[in-house]
Amino acid sequence: MTKKTQVGLIFGGNSSEYEVSITSAGNIYKAIDKDKFDVHPIWITNSGYVASEADSYKVLEEPGYMVEKNDKTANLSNLIELASRPELDVLFPIVHGNLGEDGVLQGLFRLIDKPFVGVDVLAAAVTMDKEFTKILAQRAGVPVAKWVSIKRYEYEDAKNQKLSYDWVSGQLGTSNLFVKPSNQGSSVGITHVTDDSNYAEALAEAFKYDDKVLVEEGIVGTEVETAVLGNDHPVVSGVGQIINADNTWYSYENKYSTESTTTLQIPAQIPAETAEKVQENALKIYQITECSGMARVDSMLRESDGEVIFNELNALPGFTNISMYPKLFEEAGISYPDLITRLIRLAEERYAHKKTLLRKHD
């Protein structure tokens, strides 16, 4: 009988995307092929404590469950103890947001010498920062929305021209703007701004989450997403379409609320040549950012000329019931359990390859 792979499923975290992580982890736990894998849930509470395995199972069953008492050793440093758990063959982090998909956890996994699902340290750090991702996309020849970057020291300078809506909208050539933290996901901290009335408030909201804020031109058109899977030879899924109600956008509420007015269309109702361009751009960005394992790439089809404009890359896409990433591969014939299996095998393949690299000069 083939020995099962022991998987450490890490989820939760002290992050604005905590609830998304819990939901994603629950879905992965339900869908994973239990004939091939034994799952060991590892819950990081929203207070930053690492819960026991018993409590970790409990929160997957009851997402609102809270640990009644944290013992004195229950803190984030417990993750280093993963190194002394030889029964764990591979780690599957589904910790969204800061500390989870920005290279921090990935660096820890490298230190403790464990294979892990998803992008490696460099790609995690780069793709968490929307500005750096846009710069690399431009380098790859992919069009991006125009933007102005504001650092905290600039924000704290009352005389800085970037604090003026009129100046920024003039630079970007439009009154239709999105103000967003550069390092954040799930549309957290993003505000749609169309005049001076809420620009200052939008900046204040975004700076709650990051020390760098982007003000981007709003692209009028169709929002589409595609999924990428693989290491050196990735495959790109078909294209899905985000259909928002009139005068709305794909906000956090529209992504995750039960009252969402947004629907997903798979496949997207767009011309074949446009879909091919979306896929081509997604692959270019995936490769130039040195992603591996998985990513979801979001784009806009500009209404005025049909140009495919890169929006952002999510290196740890959601696995909720309404998440586009697993749905796109399901449409391509890869079931949810098979997708999870492939992600784990990709992690093992990357780890095995890195073991062949020399660490010192002979």
UniProtKB/Swiss-Prot annotation:
InterPro entries according to UniProt: ATP-grasp, ATP_grasp_subdomain_1, D-Ala_lig_Van_CS, D_ala_D_ala, Dala_Dala_lig_C, Dala_Dala_lig_N, PreATP-grasp_dom_sf
Cofactor: Mg(2+); Mn(2+)
UniProt keyword annotations, A-Z: ATP-binding, Cell shape, Cell wall biogenesis/degradation, Cytoplasm, Ligase, Magnesium, Manganese, Metal-binding, Nucleotide-binding, Peptidoglycan synthesis
Enzyme Commission (EC) number: 6.3.2.4
Record note on cofactor: Binds 2 magnesium or manganese ions per subunit.
GO CC terms of this entry: cytosol
Annotated pathway: Cell wall biogenesis; peptidoglycan biosynthesis
Database matches in Pfam families: Dala_Dala_lig_C, Dala_Dala_lig_N
Compartments where found: Cytoplasm
Family label: Belongs to the D-alanine--D-alanine ligase family.
Protein name: D-alanine--D-alanine ligase
Organism this protein belongs to: Lactobacillus delbrueckii subsp. bulgaricus (strain ATCC 11842 / DSM 20081 / BCRC 10696 / JCM 1002 / NBRC 13953 / NCIMB 11778 / NCTC 12712 / WDCM 00102 / Lb 14)
Lineage: Bacteria, Bacillati, Bacillota, Bacilli, Lactobacillales
Gene coding for it: ddl
